[in-house]
């Protein structure tokens, strides 16, 4: 789970207006709300909104978006990628091939080991302008037919293909975030 410190370090400075009418937003909210879990932080008024299809633990492969509600409004959309395997990669960059277009991101990766010799590496990035993970990147994945990712490590690499379910989950989260009034910001 993301720490409050991580969110606090990524304060937006400029908002972008979204093209959702009130009626479209209400219809989208009714459509997407059942696809998500909401977990309230007992020490603040933060509510974590995560797709029901997202892995519950770090020691699982996964890719998804989620966001936090604060004061009843959605806060920065986030992109999470989790790698779980037998071999360390020490991921330094990731190349996403989205319907034939390559987009490179330089994620801020965390690593851990355990679980009978297995390892896991993950990134959790704010979706904001000025980052390599911005709204255009998420929109491309959300509307893609095919997404492959090459994780370039310090000595090795691995490739994965996003499933149709993972792509749909990113699209659902993106649309739900916008329907709730979520804004994309510049840092």
Predicted features along the sequence, with ranges:
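A generic "folded-domain core" signal
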Residues: 2-187
